[in-house]
């Protein structure tokens, strides 16, 4: 019973985006409340853990370990990084507000996670450039959070104090924040950004509680969430159902 409780008291969130957008700095700020002084390129994957109080301030409050899996964005490792994708309970998509291409590439990151989760020969499936969230049945049930970094370098923010939401956030019905990872006030306790992030963590935990209470039916997590994709167990290939 104790082992089962420990397994239930943690969730895994993928933090993905192009190289150089500031994923490692963001994860460090989330987990430690401090700015990362010396950032370096992530090779493979780096994992940091934050203790999150689920449903804080309510009778249901309880601590959860939130594992943030910072996946390296280098194209040279794109054929191997799918090993980090199974299982997944939530996704944080990170883009550089000064680099529009990094925002556009978030669609490729989503399709990579959805199509490659679970490993095997699925890694040979080509990425989907024109990702459409509506075509993935049940995808909206997998919590997604979008973060735009380098807020301080955006002229729109300097003049109005706001940055318009990204199209990918709208398409996925995901919440979104913009941050300056060089300023710890970006995620200061009680701030709007911190509250939104906390709500996202709660959603991830609630989703994990729901999915772990179901039988898997022989399919991986994202195959269950996206019934249009079903893996042929004999050939390890995907077939479309329904």
What spans do the regions from the language model cover?
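TRAFAC-class small GTPase G-domain
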Residues: 1-212, 240-242
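Coiled-coil-like amphipathic alpha-helices with heptad-repeat character
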Residues: 7, 76, 219, 225-228
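Generic N-terminal initiation segments characterized by hydrophobic and/or small/turn-forming residues
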Residues: 23-26, 94, 219, 225, ...
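Intrinsically disordered, low-complexity regulatory segments enriched in Ser/Pro/Gln/Gly
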Residues: 210-224
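Extreme C-terminal disordered tails of eukaryotic proteins encode short linear targeting/docking signals used
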Residues: 225-242
